[in-house]
A protein has these predicted regions:
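A local structural motif
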Residues: 1-3
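Glycine-rich beta-strand-centered segment in the early N-terminal region that forms part
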Residues: 5-22, 35-78, 100
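NAD(P)H dinucleotide-binding glycine-rich loop of Rossmann-like/cofactor-binding domains
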Residues: 40, 74-139
Length: 139
């Protein structure tokens, strides 16, 4: 292990300061069977897909989130088109595509929010700007 550089948000991305992460089944499967899955990954790499924390940076074109907002996110660094260690959740700061993040109400802990992206993948995409007020008041 080594320190990871602070990632910058690009267009349509946010940077989340992680307060909780969840172990997605793909994370332990990748570690168990190695390059039989995600063989395109370039190392060094940071695994982890599901996280929750606060937005610390927003990229251009992001209008749904502001710095300081509590969010959950589904990081897709293992996606063949992304292949980015900055998008792995097992670190202090994670880059997440804005459409794969959702507001987290104050009544929901970060630990509980971090486990939502795996069983509910449509959740972040469903919390569009038209519904974000509903998403921010109910878990």
């Amino acid at each position: 292990m080594a320190p990871a550089p602070y990632p910058r948000a690009r267009e349509n991305e946010i940077v989340i300061r992680n307060r909780a992460v969840a172990i997605n089944p793909l994370d332990w499967i990748k570690q168990s069977i190695g390059d039989l899955i995600f063989s395109w990954i370039r190392y060094p790499f940071v695994l982890g897909a599901d996280c929750a924390g606060e937005v610390v940076e927003v990229g251009d074109s992001v209008t749904r989130f502001a710095v300081g907002v509590r969010v959950l996110g589904h990081a897709v660094g293992t996606d063949r088109k992304r292949n980015s260690a900055a998008e792995g959740a097992f670190q202090h700061y994670t880059v997440v595509l804005a459409h794969l993040a959702a507001p987290v109400p104050d009544s929901l802990s970060y630990e509980d929010a971090a486990v939502l992206p795996w069983p509910c993948p449509p959740l972040p995409a469903g919390c569009s700007s038209r519904t974000s007020s509903a998403c921010s008041t109910r878990p």
